[in-house]
């Protein structure tokens, strides 16, 4: 149950932070209260490392909807532990960083940290979920919390657009993911992930296997910003920098990669998956690195560099996916190398990219700009950030003695050995190596170019609006700690490899500790080999391009992503246009139209049921006895109902409508139901009086002549509805297997204290229902009151 307590603890801290909204002084400490949550979470995951290394996994299952195998099923294994450590440890740094970044006087700190806690809660939920539907719930919660965080500064138009764009794309991917999970349930009859993976061979032979893969890939590609779904990530940079450092570099964008790692033993059985993931990753890596060179905004550069690095990791996920169909120890060694490298670089990327984002946030916060055309010579005012960002950028570029070099060399090693696989021949291997090397060169180029344009050169304070620029120590502390980790990981990589990455590799492989024989030992020196030569080539060419070429003059010649973004905007505008037309057609403020739509849907559902199940055989028909009074009432009601269709005087219509109600009252009397008759009489009288009184408040709308076609259609709808209700009565009469409720009538007085069965039912069963109905009316009344008292934001006095 420890996983349940962990999730409950995070929810508890959300409630505590929510409580700080109640007092102005408490709001200032909301961030420090929220900081306790990632500290507790990271402590929990660190304490579980020894158990996971010994393959002692934690599993919890609480029934939710067991009939369809939807349960609160949580599991902590090596993969979820690694991601949990990244989420929580990076979270500690980001939460503390945010307390220094946000204003304690103007920003709503509790609201921000509630959103951030909700996101961390959702991400942890994704990585420990062992049920596909539960994973989907957490998956969409990350999209919702991301939307709230991106739009935190909601008065900023860019924040609004970025939030909507990211939400639209990631939710679209989430729906595709849900479709894939439903297909898996259709094939296997279970939503439990471990059970699904145990049936992988049977699933791979099913005709829905490929459609399921494509749906899961859509979910992963949209979440992890893969081409062409990458366009939401640069727009999301409108969020506060702590959000960018946490969600859009270290955690949320890794959710899609986590999904593919989790299902690798199943998805890797298809070559469609292997080719698609590998080449989408390579294209994304190349496109992201090339587009980063045409950015002037530091966060824009980091956004596209994140896209590129995610593409690099995705490439390794695709190449290593073939392990699911391996046939020899040599191939197993290669596949495990690639998967291990992907996990290793994922960890390295979280460290150096988060440090870069924090550095950019400090520069922006203190200088008031992120434009590299203005940020020259900043090493003089930001000496600590100069060192932090230089080391982090060089690590991203793959320079020796930094952690990024190790995983980058493993990546190049994976590319050079691709020709050993059945899926790749010489030509494809050459293409893969070429794209990987070119993208790596461009990565080195924009990394060093960013540092050169920001920190080197001549410092001119006149370019900045703020003349007092300084570098607060507490503000810089999280970035400095992350920077120190970069060389530490390089010199003691196997500490992280054995305690974090090895257990994760076991989980990804699907065979547990048996994979240990193939897991590589991370070495800083492998001798002179092809990957080392390629690394040297990348560094030399990257240095030349970064230091010699004036990218400010040639960026307009580089490919632009505007066409894809413009395509999204065009689709979104068309979507809004057609949505507006549809809403105007559907919501036309005509009550009778709404009623007809409701009745039509009801009839359609009933007819669909008859077509699917079939109309039951009529073996018994109960018709109540009736006399002259019932006949007269029926005829009168029919005549009045037909008259209402053609009469246009409002007062006459209300009176006739009331007469129908009073006729129903007489029906109840004839059927010997005096309580119902009295209730109907009171309700009908009050309703009729209120209707007439309300005329004094209604506008004087001119009378409209009856349209014969429309009125005929109304008559048809009414007749069809009447036939539907009668048919349902026939169906109800044929049911003879229902349990008797006569016993309740006998005990009604003793149990409820009511002498009348109707009163007993209303008092015993409808009390709670009536209470909530009253609550709904109160909420509706508050909404109406708000609308009536709403003033136009432009300062006009007229009410909406």
From Swiss-Prot:
Q: A GO molecular function for this record?
A: antiporter activity
Q: Where in the cell is it found?
A: Cell membrane
Q: Fetch the InterPro entries from UniProt.
A: CPA3_Na-H_Antiporter_A, MrpA_C/MbhD, MrpA_C/MbhE, ND/Mrp_TM, Proton_antipo_N
**Membrane topology term:** Multi-pass membrane protein
Q: What is an annotated GO biological process for this record, any one?
A: monoatomic ion transport
Q: Keyword set for this entry?
A: Antiport, Cell membrane, Ion transport, Membrane, Transmembrane, Transmembrane helix, Transport
TM spans (from-to) = 1-21, 29-49, 78-98, 109-129, 133-153, 167-187, 209-229, 241-261, 272-292, 300-320, 336-356, 387-407, 424-444, 472-492, 528-548, 595-615, 627-647, 651-671, 676-696, 712-732, 768-788
The reply to whether Transmembrane helix figures as a keyword in the UniProt entry is: yes
The UniProt entry, under Pfam families, shows: MbhD (PF13244), MbhE (PF20501), Proton_antipo_M (PF00361), Proton_antipo_N (PF00662)
Q: What is its main location?
A: membrane
Q: GO CC terms for this protein? A: plasma membrane
Query: Which PANTHER family does UniProt cross-reference here?
Result: NA(+)/H(+) ANTIPORTER SUBUNIT, NA(+)_H(+) ANTIPORTER SUBUNIT A
> What does the subunit comment say?
May form a heterooligomeric complex that consists of seven subunits: mnhA2, mnhB2, mnhC2, mnhD2, mnhE2, mnhF2 and mnhG2.
User: Which family does the UniProt entry place this protein in?
Assistant: Belongs to the CPA3 antiporters (TC 2.A.63) subunit A family.
Which protein are we looking at? Putative antiporter subunit mnhA2
């Amino acid at each position: 149950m420890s996983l349940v307590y962990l999730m409950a603890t995070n929810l508890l801290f959300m409630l505590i932070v929510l409580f700080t909204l109640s007092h102005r002084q408490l709001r200032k400490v909301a961030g420090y209260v929220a900081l306790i949550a990632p500290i507790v979470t990271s402590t929990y995951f660190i304490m579980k490392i020894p158990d996971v290394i010994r393959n002692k996994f934690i599993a919890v299952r609480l029934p939710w909807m067991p009939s369809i195998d939807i349960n609160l099923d949580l599991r902590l294994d090596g993969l979820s532990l690694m991601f949990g450590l990244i989420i929580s440890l990076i979270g500690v740094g980001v939460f503390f960083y945010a307390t220094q970044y946000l204003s304690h006087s103007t920003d709503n700190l509790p609201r921000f940290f509630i959103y951030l806690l909700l996101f961390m809660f959702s991400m942890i939920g994704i990585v420990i979920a062992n049920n596909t539907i539960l994973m989907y719930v957490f998956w969409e919660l990350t999209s919702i919390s991301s939307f709230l965080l991106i739009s935190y500064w909601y008065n900023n138009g860019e924040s609004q657009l970025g939030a909507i764009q990211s939400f639209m794309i990631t939710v679209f991917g989430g729906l595709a993911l849900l479709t894939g999970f439903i297909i898996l349930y259709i094939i296997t009859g279970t939503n439990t992930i471990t059970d699904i993976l145990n049936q992988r061979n049977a699933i791979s032979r099913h005709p829905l296997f490929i459609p399921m893969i494509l749906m899961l890939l859509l979910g992963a590609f949209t979440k992890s910003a893969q081409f062409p779904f990458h366009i939401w990530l640069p727009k999301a940079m409108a969020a506060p920098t702590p959000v960018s450092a946490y969600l859009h570099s270290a955690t949320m964008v890794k959710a899609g990669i986590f999904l593919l790692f989790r299902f690798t033993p199943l998805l890797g059985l298809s070559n469609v998956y292997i080719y698609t993931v590998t080449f989408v990753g390579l294209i994304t890596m190349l496109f992201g690195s090339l587009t980063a060179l045409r950015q002037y905004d530091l966060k824009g550069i980091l956004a596209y560099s994140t896209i590129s690095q995610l593409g690099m990791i995705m490439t390794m996920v695709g190449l290593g996916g073939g392990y699911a169909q391996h046939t020899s120890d040599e191939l197993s060694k290669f596949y495990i190398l690639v998967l291990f490298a992907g996990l290793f670089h994922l960890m390295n990327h979280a460290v150096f990219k988060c440090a870069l984002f924090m550095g950019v946030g400090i520069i922006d916060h203190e200088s008031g700009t992120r434009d590299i055309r203005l940020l020259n010579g900043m090493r003089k005012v930001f000496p600590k950030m100069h060192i932090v960002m230089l080391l982090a950028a060089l690590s991203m570029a793959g320079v020796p003695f930094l952690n990024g070099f190790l995983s980058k060399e493993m990546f190049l090693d994976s590319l050079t050995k691709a020709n050993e696989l059945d899926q790749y021949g010489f030509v494809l291997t050459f293409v893969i190596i070429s794209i990987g090397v070119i993208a790596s060169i461009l990565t080195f180029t924009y990394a060093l170019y960013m540092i050169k344009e920001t920190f080197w050169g001549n410092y001119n304070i006149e370019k900045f609006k703020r003349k007092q620029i300084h570098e607060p120590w507490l503000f810089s502390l999280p970035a400095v700690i992350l920077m120190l980790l970069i060389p530490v990981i390089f010199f003691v990589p196997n500490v992280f490899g054995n305690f974090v990455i090895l257990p994760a590799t076991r989980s990804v492989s699907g065979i547990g500790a048996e994979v240990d024989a193939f897991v590589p030992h991370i070495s800083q020196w492998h001798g002179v080999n092809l990957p080392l030569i390629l690394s040297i080539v990348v560094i030399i060419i990257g240095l030349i391009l970064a230091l010699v070429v004036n990218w400010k003059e040639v960026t307009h010649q580089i490919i632009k992503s505007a066409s894809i973004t413009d395509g999204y905007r065009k689709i979104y505008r068309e979507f809004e246009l057609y949505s507006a037309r549809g809403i105007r057609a559907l919501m036309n403020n005509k009550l009778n139209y709404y009623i007809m739509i409701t009745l039509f849907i009801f009839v359609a559902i009933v007819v669909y049921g008859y077509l699917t199940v079939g109309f039951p055989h009529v073996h018994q028909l109960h018709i109540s006895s009736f006399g002259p009074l019932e006949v007269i009432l029926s005829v009168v009601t029919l005549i009045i109902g037909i008259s209402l269709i053609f009469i246009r005087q409002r007062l006459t219509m209300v009176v006739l409508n009331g007469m129908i109600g009073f006729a129903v009252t007489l029906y109840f009397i004839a059927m010997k139901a005096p309580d119902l008759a009295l209730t109907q009489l009171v309700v009908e009288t009050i309703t009729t009086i209120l209707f007439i009184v309300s005329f004094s408040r209604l506008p004087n709308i001119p009378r409209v002549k009856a349209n014969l076609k429309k009125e005929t259609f109304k008559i048809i709808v009414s007749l069809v509805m009447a036939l539907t209700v009668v048919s349902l009565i026939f169906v109800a009469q044929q049911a003879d297997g229902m349990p008797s409720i006569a016993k309740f009538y006998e005990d009604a007085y003793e149990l409820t204290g009511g002498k009348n069965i109707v009163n007993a039912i209303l008092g015993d069963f409808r009390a709670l229902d009536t209470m909530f109905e009253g609550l709904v009316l109160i909420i509706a009344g508050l909404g109406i009151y708000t609308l009536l008292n709403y003033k136009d934001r432009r300062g006009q006095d007229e009410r909406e």
